[in-house]
């Protein structure tokens, strides 16, 4: 199984450690195409890559993915775009949201009946939500 993990990069890296732990867990289910999202200093690692290269690479990964897990705790234009693109490809999508961040979840996520979104407070809770999502997809 190929899994596309989406998390904020340019929109803010407050959840970087959480991304890393979730991505590590997702490797139990298959190949995580976007494991770099959990890396420290990702912005420095991608400095040599043009925006066009990043866009084309990520779209290619989305087209090859069987499933998307998106952490939507930190608002991100890129993550929103990726979710919308994955939706057009009919890829099952799980959006994870941690309310401790105090940032409101976009109605474009919470109101969309074509995707699943769940709140979590700990990484362990997120893992259980992932397990349930994987079982049903």
Segments (PLM) and residue ranges:
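Conserved catalytic or regulatory cores that recognize and/or transform ribose-phosphate-containing ligands
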Residues: 1-137
């Amino acid at each position: 199984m190929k899994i596309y993990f989406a998390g904020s990069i340019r929109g803010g890296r407050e959840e970087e450690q959480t991304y890393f732990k979730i991505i590590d867990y997702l490797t139990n289910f298959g190949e995580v195409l976007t494991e770099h999202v959990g890396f420290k200093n990702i912005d420095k690692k991608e400095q040599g890559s043009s925006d066009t290269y990043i866009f084309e690479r990520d779209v290619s990964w989305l087209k090859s993915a069987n499933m998307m897990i998106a952490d939507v705790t930190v608002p991100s234009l890129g993550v929103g775009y990726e979710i919308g693109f994955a939706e057009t490809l009919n890829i099952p999508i799980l959006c994870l949201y941690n309310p401790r961040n105090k940032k409101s979840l976009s109605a474009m996520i919470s109101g969309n009946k074509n995707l699943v979104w769940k709140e979590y407070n700990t990484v362990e809770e997120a893992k259980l939500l992932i397990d349930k999502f994987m079982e049903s997809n």
